[in-house]
Amino acid sequence: MAVLLLGEVTNGALNRDATAKAVAAVKALGDVTVLCAGASAKAAAEEAAKIAGVAKVLVAEDALYGHRLAEPTAALIVGLAGDYSHIAAPATTDAKNVMPRVAALLDVMVLSDVSAILDADTFERPIYAGNAIQVVKSKDAKKVFTIRTASFDAAGEGGTAPVTETAAAADPGLSSWVADEVAESDRPELTSARRVVSGGRGLGSKESFAIIEELADKLGAAVGASRAAVDSGYAPNDWQVGQTGKVVAPELYVAVGISGAIQHLAGMKDSKVIVAINKDEEAPIFQIADYGLVGDLFSVVPELTGKL
């Protein structure tokens, strides 16, 4: 058996955390080949080659892959699929766009958010907002799946995998790049951050979210938000943590003004230490918190920030 793993490449750089955790998840299935695709992907490929457990790295450099369009990447993967029994990717926003297309082109099912691999055909994935674990046995000749990287520790350094160039696939011509609107931030990326401070609807306004950002900056943390806060317009969509947002498992997760709806808990319950700040002592978030503080967040959070 052999595994083709799509590396997460953004602006020519490898998302090492997501890729290394995915390598750790699949390495027991057989030799792991990491595919790095982008307009500039050689540096990312060299980085992927250093990850322990990687047997080979393929690099596809072409302007076609420069704007993260799903259709060209899916076509590239399908063209390489013949040599592999398993095709996987970390469950990032990009991969969730690409992998279902790969599965459709191969006429197999896609397994999303795999949290454990029991054997070559059997996988576990969370369902019902993380309240149950589904065991899935696939009879497809090729398994296509995304990996819930929060469930795995990252593979270490020390790899010396060879890097080989591969030709770009033909452009399917189904979509074209128009423009990128990128928000610049000095904060760590949400899904790989060691610390996360998230705010909920209890903040009351977009302006009040500034106190969350100030605390996060003092902690060197990423900023997250509940779905309720995002839906209310208090925070941008890419900050959303939860079942329909991003899944995180940092060393420290601080939930401020978040009640603890099941949808939110599904995205952060694997955090190592959870701190909850809420004025409602009956809030469900306190049931999973390691540390809880009942109080007015508008008093407590600025005081905490001031003491850091």
UniProtKB/Swiss-Prot annotation:
Keywords assigned by UniProt, alphabetized: Electron transport, FAD, Flavoprotein, Transport
Function as written in the Swiss-Prot or TrEMBL entry: The electron transfer flavoprotein serves as a specific electron acceptor for other dehydrogenases. It transfers the electrons to the main respiratory chain via ETF-ubiquinone oxidoreductase (ETF dehydrogenase).
Presence of the UniProt keyword Electron transport in the record: yes
Sequence positions that bind FAD: 252-280
Protein name from the UniProt record: Electron transfer flavoprotein subunit alpha
Claim: Cell wall biogenesis/degradation is one of the keywords in the record: no
SMART domains: ETF (SM00893)
Cited SUPFAM superfamilies: Adenine nucleotide alpha hydrolases-like, DHS-like NAD/FAD-binding domain
Disulfide cysteine pairs (residue numbers): none
GO biological process, one term: fatty acid beta-oxidation using acyl-CoA dehydrogenase
InterPro entries in alphabetical order: DHS-like_NAD/FAD-binding_dom (IPR029035), ETF_a/b_N (IPR014730), ETF_a/FixB (IPR001308), ETF_alpha_N (IPR033947), ETF_asu_C (IPR014731), ETF_asu_C_CS (IPR018206), Rossmann-like_a/b/a_fold (IPR014729)
Cofactor: FAD
Co-factor binding comment: Binds 1 FAD per dimer.
Family stated for the protein in its record: Belongs to the ETF alpha-subunit/FixB family.
One Pfam family in the UniProt entry: ETF_alpha
Gene Ontology molecular-function annotations: electron transfer activity; flavin adenine dinucleotide binding
The protein's assembly and partners: Heterodimer of an alpha and a beta subunit.
